[in-house]
A protein has these predicted regions:
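Hydrophobic transmembrane alpha-helices and their helix-loop junctions in integral membrane proteins
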Residues: 1-174
Length: 174
């Protein structure tokens, strides 16, 4: 159980780092973290681009909105156990059943899906980010359901089934 907790902690820190970068980029771009102040400014910022390779003399432009969405989505991938950061969820079932039920029910794993849904006005301005959300969600859905079919331990079946259902929800957001 200790190894599972360590894995869950480390994988979620990867997601948290992406989420933190997304929040930082929102603050730098909009000057606020309040929904009521950010969403009205979306039309003014929608055309802004950043040259990611400018410091190296290259040229690769990406929309600021797309960068924000992708960083926020990395956070959602970690919290909602989407591929490739899904490895922690099945192992988290090693704990006591009440704790496992809390993790797999409506608490932690749905937070990432809720965040993507709550930021829908932002994600709607980035077709690239919407495609990434749909593809990752669909992949997670398929992988989770396929692995669930091969499991013999009921706790792992529930874990992979939860993974698949989270993939459905994430795909619907994309």
């Amino acid at each position: 159980a200790r190894a599972a907790a360590t894995k869950a902690f480390l994988v979620n820190r990867i997601g948290d780092f992406g989420f933190m970068l997304g929040i930082l980029l929102i603050f730098v771009t909009f000057g606020s973290l309040q929904y009521q102040q950010v969403f009205p400014q979306l039309d003014h910022v929608a055309g802004g681009v950043v040259n990611l390779l400018g410091a190296l003399g290259g040229h690769w432009e990406i929309s600021v909105i797309t960068m924000i969405c992708l960083f926020l989505f990395i956070g959602a991938v970690g919290k909602s156990a989407q591929v490739p950061l899904h490895v922690w969820l099945p192992d988290a079932m090693e704990g006591p059943t009440p704790v496992s039920a809390l993790i797999h029910a409506a608490t932690m794993v749905t937070a990432g899906v809720f965040m993507v849904a709550r930021f829908a006005p932002l994600f709607n301005l980035s077709p690239v980010a919407m495609d990434v959300v749909a593809i990752v969600g669909g992949t997670t859905m398929f992988i989770g359901a396929t692995i669930a079919l091969t499991q013999t331990d009921i706790k792992r079946v529930v874990a992979y089934s939860t993974l698949s259902q989270l993939g459905y929800m994430m795909m619907a957001c994309g």
